Amino acid sequence: MKNFLCEDFLLSNETARRLYHEHAFHQPIYDYHCHLNPAEVTQNRQFDNLGQIWLEGDHYKWRGMRSAGIEERLITGDASDYDKYMAWAKTVPQTLGNPLYHWTHLELRRPFGITNTLFSPDTADQIWHQCNELLATPEFTARGIMQQMNVVMAGTTDDPIDSLEHHKAIAEDDTFNVKVLPSWRPDKAFKIELDLFADYMHKLGEVADIDIRRFDDLLSALDKRLAHFDSHGCRAADHGIEIVRYAPIPSEADLDALLARRLSGEVLSELECAQFSTAVQVWLGKRYAQLGWVMQLHIGAQRNNSTRMFQLLGADAGFDSIGDRPFAFELAHLLDEMDQTNELPRTILYCLNPRDNEMMATMIGNFQGGGIAGKVQFGSGWWFNDQKDGMQRQMEQLSQLGLLSQFVGMLTDSRSFLSYTRHEYFRRILCDMVGRWAENGEVPNDLSLLGPMVEDICFGNAKRYFEERA
């Protein structure tokens, strides 16, 4: 019987163990998509205590706490960090079977070095004091943790109107060797149905020094901001798409009219929203191709389901779930609009509903080519799927319907500096899967063949994919 979270955690066979310890473990982390606040890296934030660094902004943990009956005051309310931490300690023993239990103990092990101690109300005070002592040292600041975890690149998520002042400051700081690069998140520019759309057009126009009245004004403003992002090292865009919309792109005069009507406060039809969204996203995709950027499409979240809690806490507070709208037709046509002129950028497609895995794994095969290995990617198990079964499903389906060897691997998609252990979690699951294939005779049990593939999936593929500009 194995002990919990031993050195061979999740590694069920000898080949898996060798793949992980000899090939995966020491690979650097190329965290190409996250939601870290770059200001906290610039300022090298020193966290006051374990409760603060662990629970601040982590809606995964918040959902678990609510399900365990913890009152909101102890989750997002005005309770002290210690009281929130103790509420989390009360919750964790109830999360057995949920990845939260694994993540919690992995995060205590790395970087804090706490092993052979289960987190519970009985051990919480001891762990609180031990971790707080470490958090007061230079090795456990925001930058210190990134360096301890061997992070070489973190791609943040940034609005086109952002100044990127913090990314500039980090890039100019020779004392810090981790790249923190912006990623372009233009959702508010193509989701014309949003209540805040007109206000956002005003803000975008101000930053770009363009009065946005016509469709071409919008494209000019976006183009200025694209240049700004590119000059600050941006290599990726990310579109959050709850509903994939596609409609044939109308004339520029029609797009001008749609924009004018929306800016005046008129509500547009679903078809008109689809026409506008398609026009903007296709234009953006072609610009990404020209710039040598990667386009990421995160598809299928159903957001802000609780009106009451949205009004109380706002977005990204743990009230989102998996959507179930079909989107294969719309996605194929959206990508094809760019591909018809050979201007589809390197693209990563993520789906939140695992029902769509096989569809996505076959969709990427429609648009490969151009001499680029893995040009269009089926992204790693996202959000509700970044757990053992979800990540294994995604990789097995990719291997059966595409090329696992070209996969760009894991990303944290997280707001927490302690989430880098998710790369370890992913790597263990990857090595166990490949090791199992070898032990079953499904692939050659040859580490000279399997080892380099594992290394590439853990690091090399992502580095090449995001750093090549062609």
From Swiss-Prot:
MF annotations from Gene Ontology: glucuronate isomerase activity
Catalytic reaction equation(s): D-glucuronate = D-fructuronate; aldehydo-D-galacturonate = keto-D-tagaturonate
GO biological process: D-galacturonate catabolic process; D-glucuronate catabolic process
Keywords from the UniProt entry: Isomerase
Entry keyword annotation includes GTP-binding: no
Residue ranges crossing the lipid bilayer per the database entry: none
Pathway(s) it belongs to: Carbohydrate metabolism; pentose and glucuronate interconversion
Pfam family, one: UxaC
Known EC number: 5.3.1.12
Principal EC category: isomerase
NCBIfam families listed in its UniProt record: PRK02925.1
Family from the record: Belongs to the metallo-dependent hydrolases superfamily. Uronate isomerase family.
Protein name (Swiss-Prot/TrEMBL): Uronate isomerase
Gene field: uxaC
